[in-house]
């Protein structure tokens, strides 16, 4: 298993100085990073900084807006330039059957396009993805049943949704290549591992 840092965790640094943030992450001993935006920096600059600090990209959190047809080629080119083979959709509003249907359709269109470029598509869950819609659909279950998208399981949000993260990972291990391991206070208040409500050991 490889460990890395999600750059969103140090967003106060990345927003002002992505290069400096990468340097500090490397000095902390990390070898892998997951980007949550590039703050307007070019792929060439990001690649050079990764090489300078001996870092590798595990993946990126890329909003669905950056995967629309009009910008998809640009997004793919950027990821290939920095050596990233995994794109993760960090969030989608899936509160109704209509929203789920539209998302499923888009995901099923994106997957083969990305696969043709050597890139895998993942979805990062929040607690709301386990909440039934008014029509009785559970978003996470619908994605598993109706698409081949991979999952990046957020253990904290899975726990907040009153699911057992360990059992969920075991049940869907073939669809899970990445895990977000974190802690918090049962809401959006983050805590260091072991300092929140999640049973992290």
Question: Where in the sequence are the language-model features?
Answer:
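N-terminal pre-domain/capping segments
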Residues: 1-85
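Active-site groove signature of glycoside hydrolases
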Residues: 79-98, 117-127
């Amino acid at each position: 298993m490889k460990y890395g840092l999600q750059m969103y965790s140090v967003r106060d640094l990345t927003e002002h100085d992505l290069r400096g943030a990468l340097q500090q992450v490397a000095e902390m001993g990390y070898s892998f990073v997951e980007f949550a935006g590039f703050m307007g920096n070019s792929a060439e600059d990001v690649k050079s900084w990764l090489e300078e600090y001996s870092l590798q990209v595990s993946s990126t959190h890329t909003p669905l807006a950056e995967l629309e047809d009009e910008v998809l080629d640009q997004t793919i080119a950027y990821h290939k330039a920095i050596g990233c083979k995994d794109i993760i959709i960090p969030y989608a509003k899936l509160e109704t059957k209509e929203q789920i249907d539209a998302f499923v359709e888009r995901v099923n269109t994106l997957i083969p396009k990305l696969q043709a470029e050597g890139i895998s598509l993942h979805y990062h869950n929040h607690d709301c993805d386990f909440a039934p819609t008014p029509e009785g659909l559970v978003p996470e279950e619908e994605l598993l049943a109706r698409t081949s998208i991979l999952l990046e399981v957020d253990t904290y949000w899975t726990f907040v949704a009153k699911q057992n993260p360990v059992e969920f990972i075991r049940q869907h291990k073939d669809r899970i290549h990445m895990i977000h391991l974190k802690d918090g206070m049962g809401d959006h208040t983050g805590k260091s591992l072991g300092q929140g409500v999640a049973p992290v050991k």
